[in-house]
């Protein structure tokens, strides 16, 4: 695992603070960025390199972990990537704030309906949970005794699970837990969906070294969770390359569900009735390895990739499903600016809420409901799976699995050209953009293309080897089959 610094735009100084200076609205853009905001950024560990009064923003150098923590601060409204940078707009004091990804999956009403994952046991297998009880968004979770168990499989004799730190990534599990269960009552900020589930935490990975022994820790953690009756497990861990000993590295063709850890994950699902939600991994932009990592390749586990926020296109880093798998991987995807580690817990939190509604759902039923709620379903691909899940659709299916939603339109294209006029009621702004997934089979993507949201007439010329094209107009989908 690596965590390198990157230039980051943090849009700042709340407009409310500027208005308190008595400035007319037209002069707000000329007001200086509020000093208290800049001081807050510095205290959070960000190194400010530039300040823009027009953008009401500061440019900083921050690691991905620091940027993720900044995103969760009360003064940050949202975080979105902009040409390789991050942008975090200031957070105004609105009622019941949620993070952008929760807005993307349409989960705003879950809190209104009292869906918090209450009574559901959730296991989290990760690197470490350093200082988790001290995080503002997790204090209530610990104070109300929702963290029911902890076990360190890396260093069992360490003791003091939340104050002992062995590596620079020992707070990774803490951040994942925040994405699962975080809620800051002071700012009415909901970070995760399953704020009242019961959690069992397992540390199986050492952040400063990588070896196959960690896969054994993972399997032992699964067995421990199974013995406690845990039926929903989240893990943002994955293994492919980067082992300390090069001979331990996997080869791409081994991402076929045959690894030790993948076989255990598949057994957990098929024989033990556990629903495993696993991040796809962040190797999608690597030259020699673009695939998801094991155990995300296991049949039956719910693998989650990453999209951007505005168009729902695959993030460059998000791991791709190998073409030789007989099933679609990843299964779903949603927004994260900093890695698939923070998409899996979003879907796990959604799953916990569905189990609260219907505790009798099997692992297979729960997984299928989540996939059916994806905006591309049933036309999944190896970039973003069945797409971005829709929480309200999933809720309806959890209550009545016989519901049938309108299927995407399938059209046949003769020759090498295809044209289509977008219906006026197919909205795209705020609901995903216009995206083409150009494929060499029903599921395997050749390339993805993002078009202007103003596009009304689409003219396609068939690519070499292209057999299918998925056209996404927001949440409306058209599947083109080339003849």
Question: Which residues fall in each region the model found?
Answer:
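Short, aromatic- and glycine-rich surface loops/edge beta-strands on solvent-exposed regions
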Residues: 428-438, 453-482
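Inhibitory N-terminal propeptides of secreted protease zymogens
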Residues: 1-89
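Structural recognition of the beta-strand scaffold that forms the well-ordered cores
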Residues: 59, 80, 121-126, 178, ...
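Hydrolase catalytic cores
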Residues: 177-180, 202-206, 291, 329-391
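Protease zymogen maturation seam
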Residues: 69-121, 131-140, 245-247, 259
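C-terminal subdomain of the subtilisin-like protease fold in secreted/lumenal serine endopeptidases
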Residues: 99, 232-234, 356-452
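Subtilisin-like serine protease catalytic core
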Residues: 109-214, 228-231, 244, 271, ...
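Substrate-binding/access-modulating region of protease and related hydrolase catalytic domains
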Residues: 186, 201-294, 337-344
């Amino acid at each position: 695992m690596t965590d390198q610094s990157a230039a980051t735009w943090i849009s700042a100084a709340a407009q409310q603070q500027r208005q308190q200076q008595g400035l007319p609205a037209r002069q707000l853009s000329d007001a200086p960025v509020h000093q208290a905001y800049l001081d807050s950024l510095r205290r959070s560990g960000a190194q400010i390199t530039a300040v823009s009064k027009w953008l009401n923003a500061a440019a900083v150098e921050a690691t991905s972990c620091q940027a993720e923590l900044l995103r969760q601060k009360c003064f940050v409204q949202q975080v979105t990537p902009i040409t390789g940078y991050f942008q975090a707009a200031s957070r105004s004091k609105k009622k019941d704030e949620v993070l952008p990804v929760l807005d993307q999956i349409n989960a705003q009403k879950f809190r209104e309906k009292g869906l918090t994952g209450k009574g559901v046991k959730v296991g989290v297998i990760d690197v470490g949970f350093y200082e988790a009880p001290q995080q503002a968004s997790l204090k209530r979770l610990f104070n109300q005794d929702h963290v029911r168990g902890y076990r360190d499989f890396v260093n069992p004799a360490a003791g003091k699970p939340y104050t002992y730190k062995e590596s620079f990534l020992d707070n990774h599990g803490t951040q994942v837990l925040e994405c699962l269960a975080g809620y800051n009552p002071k700012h009415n900020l909901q970070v995760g969906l399953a704020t009242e589930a019961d959690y069992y935490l397992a540390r199986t990975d050492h952040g400063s070294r990588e070896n196959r022994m960690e896969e054994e820790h993972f399997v032992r953690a699964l067995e421990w969770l199974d013995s406690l009756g845990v039926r929903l497990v989240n893990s943002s861990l994955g293994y492919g390359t980067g082992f300390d000993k090069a001979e331990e590295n996997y080869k791409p063709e081994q991402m076929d569900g045959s690894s030790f850890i993948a076989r255990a994950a598949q057994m957990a699902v098929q024989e033990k009735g556990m629903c495993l939600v696993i991040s796809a991994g962040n190797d999608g932009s690597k030259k020699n390895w673009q695939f998801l990592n094991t155990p995300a390749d296991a049949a039956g586990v719910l693998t989650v990739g990453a999209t951007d926020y505005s168009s729902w296109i695959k993030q460059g880093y998000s791991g791709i499903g190998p073409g030789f798998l007989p099933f679609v991987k990843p299964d779903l995807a949603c927004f994260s600016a900093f890695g698939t580690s923070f998409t899996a817990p979003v879907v796990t939190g959604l799953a916990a809420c569905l189990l609260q509604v219907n505790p009798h759902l099997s692992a297979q039923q729960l997984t299928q409901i989540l996939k059916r709620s994806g905006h591309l379903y049933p036309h999944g691909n190896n970039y973003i799976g069945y797409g971005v899940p829709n929480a309200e659709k999933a809720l309806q299916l959890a209550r009545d699995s016989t519901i049938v939603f309108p299927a995407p339109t399938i059209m046949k294209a003769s020759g090498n050209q295809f044209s289509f006029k977008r219906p006026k009621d197919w909205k795209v702004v705020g609901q995903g953009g216009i995206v083409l997934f150009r494929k060499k089979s029903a599921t395997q993507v050749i390339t993805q293309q993002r078009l202007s949201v103003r596009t009304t007439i689409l003219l396609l010329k068939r690519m070499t080897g292209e057999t299918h094209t998925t056209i996404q107009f927001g949440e409306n989908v058209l599947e083109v089959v080339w003849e």
